[in-house]
Amino acid sequence: LDVLVNNVAFQSPVDDFMELTPSQWRRTFDVNIDSFFHTIRAAVPHLTGGGAIINTGSINGLRGNKQLIDYSATKGAVTALTYSLAQSLLERGIRVNCVAPGPVWTPLIPATLPADQVGEFGRQVPYGRAAQPDEIAPSYVFFAAEQLSSYYSGEVLAPIGGETLPG
């Protein structure tokens, strides 16, 4: 195994913190961070001679989001996991980095947003729209290609549509 990409997410917006149920909280953590732990743990013995682990975070993990509290918490955990594993796996020659994009148009969007909000998705960023997946893909290629990123580990690349600060 040369490269592991962790790219999974569940989100369910709430209008008020008290709407966030313990079961939703647990499900979000199960999908968005616990799965990363288990996948990485299974992959590390197969990343012999180095390799790369690329975790998918989110701008919401860097700045929070009042309607995506659980999602934001898990993506913040992804960032911390990336930093910690970059240190822990350095002696094995494994680079660990994170791509933390802003809004990206994926099947998750119409599946989780109310229909009247789907058309507005991503309009808040300076580019005025969500990214397309192929606009984010080069971030993963960069971290996967040893000849491009051999000196990078513990980094978070945030393609966020023209924003200059994560807050």
Feature annotation, model-predicted:
Residues 11-14, 63, 148, 153-167:
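Short C-terminal tail/terminal secondary-structure segment
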Residues 15-17, 21-26, 121:
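Substrate-binding pocket helix/loop in short-chain dehydrogenase/reductase
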Residues 40, 74, 82:
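Active-site helix of classical SDR
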Residues 45, 87-91:
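Alpha-helical segment proximal to the catalytic Tyr-Lys
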Residues 58:
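Residue(s) in the substrate-gating loop at a strand-loop-helix junction
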Residues 90, 95, 151-153:
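Short, small/polar-rich loop/turn modules that mediate ligand/substrate recognition or access, typified
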Residues 98, 120-148, 152, 159-161:
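C-terminal helical subdomain
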